[in-house]
Amino acid sequence: WIYYLKADLFLIDPAVRPLSPATGISISIASLVIGWLVYDVLCKSPLEQNQILLSIIGFTFVILMAYFYQNMFSPRGAFIHTGALMATIMSANVFLVIIPNQTKVIASLKAGNAPDPRLGAIGKTRSTHNNYLTLPVLFLMISNHYPMTYSSPYAYILVGFVLIAGAMIRVFFNFRHAGKGDH
């Protein structure tokens, strides 16, 4: 909320784009909602059958949004908004997809019916996305304490490296926790 309450200080940089606080806040909120909707549509499209392609398109989408934010807000505001976009996607996955699907599965089982396996598959996809976004979101949220992370004109490219590094770290921990890695 501090980015909205003090938008002229934290969110907006007239050297990047001369926006009023109200305009900056509106763009911020709209981009988070639209970002979720774009992601949700991608996940419900035929791409859901090709997880690798869906991941590549999702990765590209986040980089494009980071570039958009970098050309719209202050450098600090851009990085925090890229993290906020991914955190919004993660939260919406839980509250709008994973929990409702689980509720339907439980209701089916309680009624003595076989649950729709597609609901579980959808939940697993969204949960997997959340798993791989967790570390990049944490990095982007704490990066505001380290100006060297967001002050470059190529900061949006750093977002890509953070996404890749976060995914690689999660793969390592996923294998290790599954007992498939060295202990």
Label for each model-derived stretch:
Residues W1-H183:
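Polytopic transmembrane helical bundles with strong interfacial aromatic enrichment
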